Each structure stands twice: as C-alpha cells, then as structure tokens.
Regions:
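Glycine/proline-rich loop-helix segments at beta-alpha junctions forming the active-site rim
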Residues: 1-79
C-alpha cells in the first residue's frame, strides 16, 4: 500500500470534501488554522495569480505557513 504521510488540500472544493466542512466554511479560516488538520492534511489556497491580493491581505501565509509546509515536506522526503 502507498505510504501517504500528508495530503495537501488545494482550494475550497478539496478542503470541504476531505475535511467534511460545511460549504459556508471560509477558505481563509481553514488555511489560517492549518495546524488543526495536521499531520494528515495541509490546506492551502490555490496557487493562482488571482490570489496575490489574498496573499497581500494575509501576510501570515508567507511568514508562517509556507516555512512550516517546506519543513514538513523536507522531513517527509528525508525519511
């Protein structure tokens, strides 16, 4: 069987489906509380140029979330 250690959930649809969320759950809230879904899931915004405004309004994304994601992926790949 595959050794899946992390599932990255990109965007609202994936997050609502895998996290069994109500459709009213806001993407920003889910992504901001990404630690609540670890170690199995890591919710992210879609990497689209249209999200540049969202990223500008949410500086924690680049300051906290991305370094945590990089560290986690490096840890998994080094095993």
């Amino acid at each position: 069987p595959p050794n899946i250690q992390l599932t990255i959930l990109v965007g609202n649809y994936a997050q609502h489906y895998y996290l069994h969320q109500k459709s009213s759950t806001k993407l920003t809230d889910t992504v901001k509380h990404y630690r609540d879904y670890l170690p199995d899931y890591f919710p992210l915004v879609h990497p689209s140029p249209r999200n540049n405004i969202w990223q500008a309004k949410n500086p924690w994304f680049k300051k906290e979330l991305l370094p945590d994601l990089k560290e986690l992926v490096q840890k998994i790949l080094s095993q």
